[in-house]
Amino acid sequence: MSGIDNLFQEETLLSNIKIAAYFILLYEHFEDVVISTVKEFYAHDCVLNGQLFLSIDDAYIQCLETRIENGEKPCTHLKHSLVSAKRERKIYKKEILGSKKNEDAKALRGSLKWLQEHYVISEEENELIFSIRKRRNTLVHELLKEIGNGLDEQDIQMIVKLLKLQQRINAWRVKQIDMPIMEIKLPKEVKPDDVMGGDDAVLESMFRILFCGEGPQFKEALEKESAKLLSKQQR
């Protein structure tokens, strides 16, 4: 199909924009999932000033330092928390980020390596993720050109593979982190690898609406639930 059709034929244009938008959305969320999953093995949740942090977050450490400098009490407890947080952050930076300054890129690369070493993903899948990342960068920085070129089945295949990888990582995370902490046991008929997180369910539903023609079914289900809720409120 020509570039003119890709840009000015409504059906084709909408299809290309849907693929590009979902591709970028999914990749950004996937990267967050990868980094946060590994972080949770090096840190713990903390609440300070009514906000939730991970103990290795720079914002959390800065907040502790500010409160100590202001002489807030109990100062001993705050100092202990600061020492502990800095120790955890140092270990995380050493084992995941390494010595390079570009922490965002290192966090992804180091986290994927960690997941590979713990047999969550394979070496081939690690390489695939960076191919998908490269494609994401092209879409973000040259979107108009790529829409003119047209997005194709290969882009859809990358989306499907990334969805499956994210679901696997999230299922592993639930099994290794959430279930032990919350002391949850799954029913015998449910396999841990089949557990789907809320974000996975949302992203898969969006995929089915956008690319599988299931919009009417979701609309009907939403209307039924809205009617039930309205009926309960009127009682």
Regions found by a protein language model. Name each.
Residues M1-Y92, R109, K113, E124-E127, ...:
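Polyanionic, low-complexity intrinsically disordered segments
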